[in-house]
Amino acid sequence: MVERKRWSEEFSEWFNEVIEEAGILDKRYPVKGMNVWLPYGLKIMRNIEKFIHEEMERTGHQEVLFPALIPETEFKKEAEHIAGFEGEVFWVTHAGHEPLDVRLVLRPTSETAMYSMFALWIRSHADLPFKVYQIVNVYRYETKHTRPLIRVREISRFFEAHTAHADFEDAERQIKEDLEIFDNLMRKLALAYIISKRPEWDKFPGAFYSLGAEVVMPDGRTLQIGTMHNYKQNFSKAYNILYEKEDGTHDYVHQTTFGMSERLLAAVIAIHGDDRGMVLPPTIAPIQVVIVPIPKKGSEEEVYSYAKGIEEELRDAGIRVYLDLRDKRPGWKFYDWELKGVPVRVEVGPIDVQNSTVVLARRDKLEKITVKREELVDKVRELFEDIMEFLYERANEWLESHIKRVDTLEEAKAVFEDRRGIVEIPWCGEESCGLKMEEELEAKMLGIPYPEEKAKAPEGSKCPVCGREAKFIARFARTY
């Protein structure tokens, strides 16, 4: 029986325990907000990144790797950007005993590192569109309560794609492609999400507009797990990124970025988990099938040999498998692998050896079936598909049941008191009314639904602050 009581009621404690006990990260490193990746956690993250690399390859992005240090002179070129980040950067002021002539910034994100180089690389319309990406460590001095994978001072698996285009239309096409890449990745992770266009006061520093992707966590707060930004020519003018057009004239490029991080793993752990621990999608599980032999006295040899044969068969079929021969009781092993979220467990005992059968236990529903040995590989593959489908449907149901449309601030407050989630409310579009609603609801405006056709307020609806005709539906949530 799947229980999710602790998972939702004591999410914070549950999450910290799972991260630690399942071997994802060790947060005891002596710098607050900087954590050590442990082998199991890093393997899961690398499996997620494998899909990111595949999508980048498919869409013609080239991988690059930039230095982590940015000269203050470059960092300060785009005024809005520096204003947005200055309060949370780490400065390098000395080399040995000597103060540096030009201070260096540990990158909080890489626009200011990359764009002086883009100005050297991009020359003509033939160089466009120009599409690169990297996965690197970035540093932000978070003053809020730090939390592993969610709010950290060293984001160590930061994915950022940067593109340059001849015109605004092509940059818009890129944003659509980013959304498609993101959706493909979410399918691989069995996650359901929403996309919102951020309000003017909360867009990325230096952007023309920003889109954010959110999931709803077990405690009803939202977690931003992806962002896409259209910069128009804001950065290319600051960094002088010009290209020669076909008619021989010059113009500034249009730019976009797309970012994700280890918050993807935080979302997977949180949204699919239950009171026993993680439930990993088979797509990214380092171990997709674990075999636990359960011998009776005197049958050890035949049970172990049978289990070994199963391990070889699954491995030959391209399935990531592990045979658990540790000197521990089966019950202890079940507990351990359930905590680690292994999608399928194979149990074999003397009766299975006699009948040429195996018992398959699925982690998502905690159900068991007995199958014939010769059907094993097909059944396991079938289970993987079933698990992916079930996880996605459950995640989608969770998301949809936590989005509530209301008309007044009173109704919105009641939703937040009751169970949090996302509240959609009519809004006139004025910043002052949006900020007033944030204050009244003690929540953040995520923005308006995207694409914008979905964002129009129903006819006759009124902004709850000023009483004027509402133009948009605005989304509010308590966020991480």
From Swiss-Prot:
Its EC number is 6.1.1.15. It catalyses: tRNA(Pro) + L-proline + ATP = L-prolyl-tRNA(Pro) + AMP + diphosphate. SMART domains: ProRS-C_1. Keywords: Aminoacyl-tRNA synthetase, ATP-binding, Cytoplasm, Ligase, Nucleotide-binding, Protein biosynthesis. One of its GO terms (biological process) is prolyl-tRNA aminoacylation. GO terms for cellular component: aminoacyl-tRNA synthetase multienzyme complex; cytoplasm. Homodimer. Consists of three domains: the N-terminal catalytic domain, the anticodon-binding domain and the C-terminal extension. This is Proline--tRNA ligase.
